[in-house]
Amino acid sequence: MIEPKILKKGAGRVWVLGDLHFGVRANSMEWLDIQKQFFEEVFLPTLKKNVKPGDVLVQVGDTFDNRQSINIRVLNYAVKLFEELGKILPVHVICGNHDIWAKNSNEVTSIDSLKWIPNVQIYKEPELLNWSGKKVLMMPWRRDADHETETLSEYPTAEIVFCHSEVKGIYLNAKVKNQHGTDSNIYEKYARVFSG
């Protein structure tokens, strides 16, 4: 059995972000401006006003959009944003399928550019954490449903899962139900599952 890494006692709330896709639409500067506006006018002020001791932020994958390249302006903004977030609260970044260079490997990723930032932890491989007595699995993108099921079976004591997964049967929006991916029933045993 894998023992969890114990984090600071008295954990507070979890702020969840997902699928930021920095560099979307071929590194569009227009889209970057929209993202900047959201973070600078809405998210960061809200976070600064409401964050409490013990709170953490989890970015559940696809921080970046393009597997092959990132515009330098896009990368610089993302790094500055995560530096700012790390000054406010601990940040956990899970690797998503758009963050990896090779389809079946998490070895080379765009989120590696964030690993040097203080108070920012990246997850390229699964890791079990203990947050205030709760066993929390941080599970990055797995190459297919079988690999995902296998990974979950390696962490039988996990109670909460933060992951980047394609889950069959969930609603992608109010009208569109995902028709492919890992069957949602493998997540039924967990108290909470947060996926990008």
Residue ranges and their predicted role:
Residues 14-16, 58, 138, 160-164, ...:
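Structural motif
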Residues 1, 29, 138-139:
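Detector for methionine-enriched segments
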Residues 8-13, 20, 24-128, 187-191:
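Core catalytic region of metal-dependent phosphoesterases/phosphodiesterases
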Residues 78, 95, 99-187:
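Conserved catalytic scaffold of divalent metal-dependent phosphoesterases
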Residues 1-7:
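A short, compositionally biased domain-edge/stem linker segment
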Residues 20, 63-64, 74, 139-141, ...:
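Long, contiguous hydrophobic alpha-helical segments, chiefly transmembrane helices and signal peptides
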